[in-house]
Amino acid sequence: MTDSIQSSITPVNIEEELKSSYLDYAMSVIVGRALPDVRDGLKPVHRRVLFSMDREGNTANKKYVKSARVVGDVIGKYHPHGDSAVYDTIVRMAQPFSLRYMLVDGQGNFGSIDGDAPAAMRYTEVRMQKITQALLTDLDKETVNFSPNYDGELMIPDVLPTRIPALLANGSSGIAVGMATNIPPHNLNEVLNGCLAYIDKNEITIDELMQHIPGPDFPTAALINGRKGIEEAYRTGRGKVYVRARATVETNEKGREQIIVSELPYQVNKAKLVEKIAELIREKKIEGISNITDLSNKEGIRIEIDIKRDAVGEVVLNHLYSLTQMQVTFGINMVALDHGQPRLFNLKEIIEAFVLHRREVVTRRSIFELRKARERTHILEGLAVARSNIDEMIAIIRNSKNREEAATSISSRSWTLHSDIINLLDASARPDELEENLGIQGEQYYLSPAQVNAILELRLHRLTGIAFEEVIKEYEELLVKIADLLHILSSAERLMEVIREELEEVKAQFGDDRLTEITAASGDIDLEDLIAQEDVVVTLSHEGYVKYQPLTDYEAQRRGGKGKSATKMKEEDFIEKLLVANTHDTILCFSSRGRLYWLKVYQLPQASRGARGRPIVNILPLQENERITAILPVSAYEEDKFVVMATAGGIVKKIALTEFSRPRSNGIIALNLRDEDELIGVDITDGSNEIMLFSSQGRVVRFAENAVRAMGRLATGVRGIKLALTNDISDDESAVEIEDISDDNAEASLDLNIDKVVSLVVPKGEGAILTATQNGYGKRTQLSEYPTKSRNTKGVISIKVSERNGKVVAATQVEETDQIMLITDAGTLVRTRVSEVSIVGRNTQGVRLIRTADDEHVVSLERVCDADEDDSLEESSSEE
């Protein structure tokens, strides 16, 4: 290798390079390919195709051009990717069954609802639809920003100045890296009515918006069964709607029942549907059908399903809905780019983003038109000067040797201006950039270079033929226009009035009737009713991967067993939170920033032990650098129950459970955290319980719950335990009272690396406390061994912290018949019977609970109630 090559090589860490490069790739896919912009509803490839067709004059009033020509123009100038990707985009924009409002007018074979492929691009021809021009209007009036194309030679718009809320009108779908979008199409009349309602009342609610926009409107029509999923999607940005084929049971001329299918759910392949029904008939999975015939033609869809004499048509139809794509679930996930950042939008936010875009477009257009109008009035003033002094002007031009000399002579002197023009002159018409010494000065007029150039551009016969009346008329019209533009720019009311007028024009020109019928929720499928109730293990990893597995996946082992893998982890990842819940429970997810989010257990991904699950950031709308630090299962929100929260810094807070009974898509503030503190535990109480806080230095404080008053959501809480400031563990169990977090003593700085709260326990009944340490040791100690103290004391020793044990990682209350689960940072999980763990005093080291490798540590402990004492449970040797 030569020295020059060697000197140009820079060593990099391959792991960091892979992370960085993959992140760059992911953002490129998200921003540059897969997600639409919330403002114009288009992905980059759609925007570039339409922009190219507009630049080439391939508009609705021109003749068709070959698709190959458009594709070549797009990939050559704006979109340096494969021609098939661009042609597929053009094809989809020309298919009446794909887009609610087609943007491309195609001539030739563009495929069919049966899944037939379109003809090659050399055979088909295209031009823009009339409605497409509404997306491109005012593009040349500096209404949007432009960016260089891939080679820097041309400029392409970042977004189109659309007058149509295309994201809702045509919807969008796409899969990016780590996120996806699926937005259904809507009726343009209804969406524009919603926009107009928002303009009239910015604080309009989503319920009020739904009076104008009742639901999606698919190009294939069909039926939407029920409104529940629509309402959820419009409120949260995510939801599911059930779309059914339009099918009726009729009696034919032979007196036999037939099911007539005339409309299909959106994106359902008709040929595959017919094939699937025929397959179900052959396999006898559907009874009562004697024949199926597809009689569809260019007039519309018609599938005839003949019913046997002894069958009931409605029953057969219900079977078809449940077993075929005659009923499908359309999962709504309204993710779009908001100025380059991916975001989940609800219905109102999408409309708001579109109206704000229109405000910017109209404002920028008005600024552009104002500048052009002022430039024109300025030129008209110059022409009026020339007309008023025509003889002198002609003499100067004739006596000048060249154009430059004439220009200098004309601009170096003052001129008189006709009194009719002087009376019309208005300061609002003066260009902003015009020098102060130019224009009207007293009764004299000084021409600018632009005016002189305009005069010299005229041929002599045109200069002498200037009609003074026409100049005055045009000047007056421009003054009226300038006044209106200034009014638009200075008045928010006038600006919104212009937006309203333009939206009403679009509605009058392109609005149409709804195609999709929204029916009552009869026969609506409740997803929760379809989910079997079972106990599951929910795990959340340090890297934020969440999943659940059936509890039966884990067999009990003797203590000291090696365990089995609970999940497949990356080298730097490990299970951080583990709990047992029912599939119908709600998981309250508390974040590192003190925010609370809601999830149903069945909404989590179900995965095997070997799978990592799904990143929780793809499920919850977490903010930047926010992570989930505590999770709590809730079956019902009872009025006499409370949620107790504890932080690593020793703060406790009590809040009524009903405060958390109204799930919000973006979460709420549950606890105001201080400094570097974070939430470590939550539990539900009845107001008369006791609270136990266990520290990593092996101490515990137990105090009455009524020592902590119920607080509001925004409160910080009070001090629960006095943590150690050094690694020296003292046996001093004396108490020092600190009444409130605001006391000066409570402000002492704490190092959570030295000591922190690791577990919150709300003891119930008698039982015992099982404590586990980093190195896999632990013990059981009767609850009666732990004395009740005041809150904010040092507490008492719960377990000896030693080199063998390591620090305490968790503690939990257990019963004799329970089992426990221990998880390590290597992803190993062991499940063992509590009865096999010895009961000893507080001030002891305990026994081995799980065998760990030298560099492996226990990170979590979870109790499993009512263990099955089946003798067949897997066993393994134990060792103390």
UniProtKB/Swiss-Prot annotation:
This protein's UniProt keywords: ATP-binding, Cytoplasm, DNA-binding, Isomerase, Nucleotide-binding, Topoisomerase
Cross-referenced PROSITE patterns: TOPO_IIA
Superkingdom of the organism of origin: Bacteria
UniProt motif (GyrA-box) ranges: 557-563
UniProt EC number: 5.6.2.2
Subcellular location, principal: cytoplasm
Active site (catalytic residues): Y123
EC class: isomerase
InterPro entries, A to Z: GyrA (IPR005743), GyrA/parC_rep (IPR006691), Gyrase/topoIV_suA_C (IPR035516), Topo_IIA-like_dom_sf (IPR013760), Topo_IIA_A/C_ab (IPR013758), Topo_IIA_A_a_sf (IPR013757), Topo_IIA_dom_A (IPR002205), Type_II_DNA_Topoisomerases (IPR050220)
GO cellular component, one term: chromosome
Subcellular localization, as worded in the UniProt entry: Cytoplasm
GO biological process terms, semicolon-separated: DNA topological change; DNA-templated DNA replication
Catalytic activity of the protein: ATP-dependent breakage, passage and rejoining of double-stranded DNA
Domain Topo IIA-type catalytic, first and last residues per copy: 35-530
Disulfide bridge positions per record: none
Pfam families recorded: DNA_gyraseA_C, DNA_topoisoIV
GO molecular function terms attached to this record: ATP binding; DNA binding; DNA negative supercoiling activity
Subunit: Heterotetramer, composed of two GyrA and two GyrB chains. In the heterotetramer, GyrA contains the active site tyrosine that forms a transient covalent intermediate with DNA, while GyrB binds cofactors and catalyzes ATP hydrolysis.
NCBIfam families: gyrA (TIGR01063), PRK05560.1 (NF004043), PRK05561.1 (NF004044)
Similarity comment: family membership: Belongs to the type II topoisomerase GyrA/ParC subunit family.
Extra information: Few gyrases are as efficient as E.coli at forming negative supercoils. Not all organisms have 2 type II topoisomerases; in organisms with a single type II topoisomerase this enzyme also has to decatenate newly replicated chromosomes.
Function: A type II topoisomerase that negatively supercoils closed circular double-stranded (ds) DNA in an ATP-dependent manner to modulate DNA topology and maintain chromosomes in an underwound state. Negative supercoiling favors strand separation, and DNA replication, transcription, recombination and repair, all of which involve strand separation. Also able to catalyze the interconversion of other topological isomers of dsDNA rings, including catenanes and knotted rings. Type II topoisomerases break and join 2 DNA strands simultaneously in an ATP-dependent manner.
Designated name of the protein: DNA gyrase subunit A
Taxon lineage: Bacteria, Pseudomonadati, Pseudomonadota, Gammaproteobacteria, Pasteurellales
Gene for this chain: gyrA
